[in-house]
Amino acid sequence: MKVRASVKKICDKCKVIHRRGVVRVICENSKHKQRQG
């Protein structure tokens, strides 16, 4: 899980989702997991 100021899709399988006001990226590749902090 990377915590970043700006979250972006890294590959085609990444999905940007909003969960309780937190922007997250979920992906099959666990290295691509991000959250906005």
Swiss-Prot record:
Q: Do the record's keywords include Ribonucleoprotein?
A: yes
Q: Which GO terms describe its molecular function?
A: structural constituent of ribosome
* One GO term (biological process): translation
Q: Which residues form the signal peptide?
A: none
In its keyword annotation, does this UniProt entry include Ribosomal protein?
A: yes
Query: Pfam families this protein is in?
Result: Ribosomal_L36
Keywords (A to Z) from UniProt: Ribonucleoprotein, Ribosomal protein
From what superkingdom does this record's organism come?
Bacteria
Q: What are the record's GO terms for cellular component? A: cytoplasm; ribonucleoprotein complex; ribosome
Family annotation (HAMAP family): Ribosomal_bL36
Its family remark reads:
Belongs to the bacterial ribosomal protein bL36 family.
Q: What protein does this entry describe?
A: Large ribosomal subunit protein bL36
Source species, please?
A: Acidobacterium capsulatum (strain ATCC 51196 / DSM 11244 / BCRC 80197 / JCM 7670 / NBRC 15755 / NCIMB 13165 / 161)
Q: What is the lineage of its organism?
A: Bacteria, Pseudomonadati, Acidobacteriota, Terriglobia, Terriglobales
